[in-house]
Curated annotation (Swiss-Prot):
Residues bound to a divalent metal cation 2: 65-66, 150
Protein name: Exodeoxyribonuclease WalJ
Names of required cofactors: Fe(2+); Zn(2+); Mn(2+)
Cellular localization per UniProt: Cell membrane
Pfam families referenced in this protein's UniProt entry, alphabetically: Lactamase_B_2
Transmembrane segments: none
Species whose genome carries this gene: Streptococcus pneumoniae serotype 2 (strain D39 / NCTC 7466)
Disulfide bonds: none
């Protein structure tokens, strides 16, 4: 592997479960493990990687679609786990984590940067209905990748932290009209549409217009709802809005889809 940059795969992204894999020459990391341990193992196998080689799992927040398999993997393979203090408390009070050895539990506070081997990782807060949700920007040499889903909006503060990355996983959770006319209870619709909910297709595109820069080469659409979105619609909305903003979509950078049950190719950035 080249010493410059790092490799990544979006193992799964969607309302049913989320997990992101990243490796450098020194570290192999997951962000979230929101599917069963068996499924995570299968997804890693798609990119010829094994869970026993993982050094750590970084956790964004305590919702089940982000932590479902964390405890199982930690008990079986012994990797370190990182989350902020409030998220740890919420996870330990949930039914998903189970017993994890105290030596594996580590604090990664919001708004801090930690070094894992040869990569720096910055945490930043988002606006979501969890106790203290945080996402991450990965930085090595002059390369960076941003994870930004599970937020009701992107504030100026957040946009400043994540601007001009080489790659993004950005939320495109729902189409507003499909959600409004769908079968969800009104209270759930309000929650998704609120500032503590999820970014719509249009919101995700607007966020990218504000944050991408001349370094940006890849934008992945993530956390699509099975019930309230259509992959082709999400993709078209992003591409069309970026094109209308004259931002070089398809030339300077490309837009990619993700899947809730199939890993994206292991990609070097």
């Amino acid at each position: 592997m080249s010493e410059i940059g790092f490799k990544y795969s979006i193992l799964a992204s969607g309302s049913s479960g989320n997990s992101f894999y990243l490796e450098t020459s020194k570290k192999k990391l997951l962000v979230d493990a929101g599917l069963s341990g068996k499924k995570i193992t299968s997804l890693l196998a798609e990119i010829n990687r094994k869970p026993e080689d993982l050094d750590a799992i970084l956790i964004t927040h305590e919702h089940s679609d982000h932590i479902h398999g964390v405890g199982v993997l930690a008990r079986k393979y012994g990797m370190d786990l990182y989350a902020n203090e409030k998220t740890w408390q919420a996870m330990e009070n949930s039914k998903y984590l189970g017993k994890v050895d105290s030596s594996q539990k580590h604090i990664f506070e919001m708004g801090k940067t930690k070094t894992f081997g040869d990569i720096d990782i910055e945490s930043f807060g988002v606006s979501h209905d969890a106790v203290a949700p945080q996402f991450y920007r990965f930085m090595k040499d002059d390369k960076s990748f941003v994870l930004l889903t599970d937020t009701g909006y992107v504030s100026d503060r957040m946009a400043g932290i994540v601007e001009n990355a080489d790659g993004y996983l950005i939320e495109a959770n729902h189409d507003v009209e499909i959600l409004r006319s769908g079968s969800y209870a009104w209270r759930l619709k309000q929650r998704i549409l609120s500032d503590l909910g999820h970014l719509s297709n249009e919101d995700g595109a607007e966020a990218m217009i504000r944050t991408l820069g001349n370094r940006t080469k890849k934008i992945y659409l993530g956390h699509l709802s099975k019930e309230n979105n259509i992959k082709e619609l999400a993709h078209m909305t992003m591409v069309n809005q970026l094109a209308q903003a004259d931002l070089g979509v398809g030339v300077d950078f490309k837009v990619y889809d993700t899947s809730p049950d199939t890993a994206t190719p292991l990609t070097e950035i």
